[in-house]
Design a protein with these regions (language model features):
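Non-heme Fe(II)-dependent double-stranded beta-helix
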Residues: 1-13, 18-119
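Short hydrophobic-aromatic micro-motifs
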Residues: 17-18, 177-179
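Active-site rim elements
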Residues: 58-61, 164-165, 186-188
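Non-heme Fe(II)/2-oxoglutarate
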Residues: 73, 176, 183-184, 188-251
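A structural signal for short, well-ordered beta-strand segments
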Residues: 86-88, 128-130, 199-203
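Catalytic core of non-heme Fe(II) oxygenases with the double-stranded beta-helix
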Residues: 95-170, 208-213
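Short Ser/Thr-interspersed hydrophobic loop/turn segments at strand-loop and sheet-helix junctions
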Residues: 135, 180-183
């Protein structure tokens, strides 16, 4: 659940940071597993910085899908979420960031939106980003334009991470960032000596998919998950009017 303060800040800014969700032991396990995959060094472009497939790397990763502290926040923002896509990011010192993107007026506007009607939020795709290493002030990492999820004007094409309106969100290892994809966001070039590591889960409303190609979940993975986690892997659909939206999950 969101506290009253967190709910206010999410509506105001488009994001909220949950502090110290993972403890040092959990962080160590996740990072050791990543190290053991012998992934190629991260490159200069975003395409060369991402990795995926980690849901097949064991409970240290699958447990993040519906983490007891984070998932109630997700279901507050998306009463019937589905996992639309997921990936990790690794950056080394000197690698470039990702340009500002997102927003209801951009190409992704059909899936990334924010509305508020009759006292209730209606969110499009919600991203949950787990910081596996420190991303502190001056080091680089996630940046955004707070409040832009409610903007009625397109993002100025000339703006990048140096624009005055752009805000860096510092995170310590173990923190979790939850944000609406309609908020303009991007990545500041990485300056720290250590590797930036994050894993991201993008949850969509249950009837919505970002791409016409859905993730192909292996039967072996499905069988290893709890009923609630399996429900997150369902394809998009609209509920019949008689169905209770809360039935999708084992609470």
């Amino acid at each position: 659940m969101l506290t009253d303060e967190e709910r206010f800040l999410f509506d105001l800014r488009g994001f909220v940071v949950l502090r110290e969700v993972l403890d040092p032991e959990q962080l160590g396990e996740v990072n050791r597993i990543i190290d053991g995959q012998e992934l190629p060094p991260p490159g200069d472009t975003f395409a060369d910085q991402i990795f995926s497939g980690f849901l097949s790397w064991g409970p240290a990763f699958t447990d993040l899908l519906d983490h007891e502290r984070v998932f109630p926040v997700v279901t507050t923002l998306l009463p019937r979420p589905r996992l639309d896509r997921y990936y990790g990011i690794r950056m080394r010192a000197g690698t470039t960031g990702l340009p500002l993107h997102g927003g209801a007026l951009e190409a992704d506007g059909q899936s990334e939106f924010y509305h508020f009607h009759h006292g209730r939020m209606a969110n499009g795709v919600i991203t949950v980003s787990w910081a596996l290493t420190d991303m502190l002030a001056g080091q680089g990492g996630f940046v955004c334009i707070p409040g832009s999820h409610k903007s009625n004007h397109p993002l100025p094409k000339s703006w990048d991470y140096r624009a005055e309106a752009v805000h860096h969100v510092p995170m310590a290892a173990g923190d979790v960032l939850v944000f609406n994809g309609a908020m303009a966001h991007g990545t500041h070039p990485w300056h720290a000596g250590h590797e930036r590591r994050s894993v991201m889960f993008k949850y969509a409303p249950g009837h919505l998919a970002w791409s016409k190609v859905y993730l192909d979940w292996a039967a072996e993975l499905r069988q290893s998950l709890s009923p609630r986690q399996q429900a997150l892997l369902e394809p998009p659909y609209c509920l019949p009017h008689h169905e209770d939206p809360t039935d999708r999950f084992v609470r």
